[in-house]
Amino acid sequence: HTPIRRQRQMCIRDSSYINNKQLGSFSIDTSNDNKYVKNPFQKVDAVIMMDCSLCPVHKDTKNDFHKYVKKHSDTIKKNGIEPMLVMTWPYKNRPEMIHALRKEFIQATNENNILLIPIGEAFHLTNNTHPEINLYQTDNRHPSRAGTYLAAAVIFGSLFQKPTLGNTALMGLSSEETLKLQNIADLTVKNFYQN
């Protein structure tokens, strides 16, 4: 993914990151010459933004996180598209990060009136209720296959407000593990949007 902070120095030309016909097949960075390509056959309904887990809570990057969530949300809305933001997860070896992440992500989405996708909340719940499921790569930061499955389930539930329970896709995981992850995703989405 291209975190919001990597986009800080890029020059947004013609909103090419929204309207490019190769949407989803490239990264945006300062050396990538993204051209605006109008595609009359493709309408984008939503853009999901995601930053690193440390950026919203680190003293040196927190202000930029909020600045660029606003900037990109405004640009996306101006193009008639709904911006959304993924709440990232605490590091495996720093579970207390959830409290600061929750605060900063809720503040950013409330200030910009955008949807928050609570993946971090689902990771937190899984870590507390099913510690036998490893959601992380060996670096304790990036998601494992199980973490990716959980994230996808939370995104689906958040976007469509439908349960994932019963989905037969295993993604290389055991059916027992996917059942637990689906239950956690559904519970997280239900509880998060009811509050």
Task: Briefly describe each language-model feature range.
Residues 142, 153-195:
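Conserved catalytic region of serine esterases and O-acyltransferases that act on ester linkages
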Residues 14, 21-22, 61, 100, ...:
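General structural signal for secondary-structure boundaries
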Residues 28, 110, 128, 186, ...:
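Generic surface-pattern signal
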Residues 15-32:
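Charged, often glycine-rich, active-site loop that binds/positions anionic groups
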Residues 148:
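Active-site oxyanion/phosphate-handling segment shared across diverse enzymes
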Residues 1-14:
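Single conserved hydrophobic/aromatic residue that forms the stacking wall/gate
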Residues 5, 27, 136-137, 161:
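Generic, ordered loop/turn and secondary-structure boundary motif
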Residues 32-145, 157:
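Alpha-helical cap/lid subdomain in secreted, periplasmic
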